[in-house]
């Protein structure tokens, strides 16, 4: 698990320009949406489901009076407890969102970023999040898209003989994603609606071109960014890496 923490912390400072851009773009999009959610739903209580290395917890603690970080992994909870030492309004809690013991209708905002792809019953998890929100509360959600080339490459990268080459190219932590439940945008919208949410805003980001990303550096990144601008909102938007939602309970 310490390897996973190391990986998550490395993503935003990666020596690879594409890898760094993909994750920083996602972080910036989530942070922008969290600020909007706090301004809309109020700055009372927020919950982050699956905080991982805790990249969003300091901002949540700035925006909200009371912040709960729930996870099933002790390493992530231990990391959150360290952050709580400097953020007294942060409370880490061991909790499984698929069988949550947190009080119903007790949060103004729930953040769930890059989590439901690890949960087989994502519909059940979304229903649980809806139940934790006060009426009118907001969910900030992100998850990878099923047909993203990056997700396909992530599966290929761990085939026998290939992973050694990939690690040699990146020269930083490379671990299997553990994604077992990748959704298309229509599937994600259907599950959100089935859980009782109304989608207020949505979007996508992230172009990954195999080999271009690994071997052409900043030149390749500029090409990927140019392609992304032309794909967003178009018929090929399902190939972008991450999908984002701001939804009301």
Predicted regions and their residues:
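Conserved SAM-binding motif I beta-strand of class I
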Residues: 66-71
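Conserved SAM-binding strand-loop segment of SAM-dependent methyltransferases
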Residues: 86-99
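A short beta-strand submotif of the Rossmann-like class I SAM-dependent methyltransferase core
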Residues: 112-115
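Conserved class I S-adenosyl-L-methionine
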Residues: 43-52
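S-adenosyl-L-methionine-dependent methyltransferase catalytic module, highlighting the catalytic core
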Residues: 3-28, 55, 72-79, 83, ...
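Conserved SAM-binding loop of SAM-dependent methyltransferases across substrates and taxa
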Residues: 53-64
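A short acidic, Gly/Pro-enriched loop at the edge of an enzyme's catalytic core
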Residues: 98-109
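Conserved alpha-helix/loop element of class I SAM-dependent methyltransferases that forms part
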Residues: 24-43
């Amino acid at each position: 698990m310490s390897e996973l923490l190391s990986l998550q912390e490395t993503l935003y400072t990666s020596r690879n320009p594409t890898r760094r851009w993909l994750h920083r773009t996602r972080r910036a999009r989530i942070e922008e949406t969290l600020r909007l959610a706090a301004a809309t739903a109020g700055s009372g209580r927020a919950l982050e489901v699956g905080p991982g290395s805790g990249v969003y917890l300091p901002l949540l603690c700035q925006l909200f009076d009371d912040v709960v970080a729930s996870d099933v992994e002790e390493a992530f909870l231990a990391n959150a407890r360290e952050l709580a030492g400097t953020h007294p309004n942060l409370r880490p809690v061991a909790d499984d969102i698929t069988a949550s013991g947190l009080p119903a209708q007790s949060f103004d905002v729930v953040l769930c970023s890059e989590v439901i792809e690890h949960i087989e019953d994502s519909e059940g998890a979304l229903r649980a999040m809806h139940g934790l929100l006060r009426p009118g509360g907001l969910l900030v959600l992100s998850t990878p898209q099923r047909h993203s080339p990056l997700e396909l490459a992530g599966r290929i990268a761990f085939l026998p003989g290939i992973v050694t080459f990939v690690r040699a190219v990146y020269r930083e932590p490379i671990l299997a994603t553990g994604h077992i439940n990748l959704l298309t945008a229509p599937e994600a919208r259907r599950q959100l609606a089935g859980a009782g949410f109304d989608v207020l805003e949505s979007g996508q980001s992230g172009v990954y071109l195999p080999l271009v990303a690994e071997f052409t550096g900043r030149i390749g990144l500029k090409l990927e960014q140019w392609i992304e601008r032309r794909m967003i909102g178009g018929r090929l938007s399902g190939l972008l890496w991450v999908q984002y939602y701001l939804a009301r309970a």
